[in-house]
Amino acid sequence: MNLVTQPLDENFSRCWHKMSQITDPGPSRALYFIDEHEKSIQQGAFGINAPNRLTLFDTSLSTWISFPGLRHAGAATVSFPDGHTESWRWRDPATLAAAKKSVWLVLQPGSGPADLDLQRIQAAV
């Protein structure tokens, strides 16, 4: 359900292969799908650094690897393995400012360890 490119990948064991494996967070809190910003789409996955689990491209935890969509009145649609969906409105000034940039929105800095939007996504992976 979550992305790892191949079984030999070092993080393959961290992937969910069955619904029963989704335990931390559980199916009602684990992010399954997110609406990605059109200036961030570069492959078939949404990348995010996860505290105590994974950091990508030698970046800090306060870095947006991929960037969430804001096309729904400043919010993105997210879905969860238990089948429910939510609309997550972004509030952090750094998130809103980055979304207005005319450049490619990959590897954008967040506002730091207190970035509430980034923390919200990180808590759901």
Which residues fall in each region the model found?
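Short, well-structured segments within or immediately adjacent to enzyme catalytic domains
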Residues: M1-V125
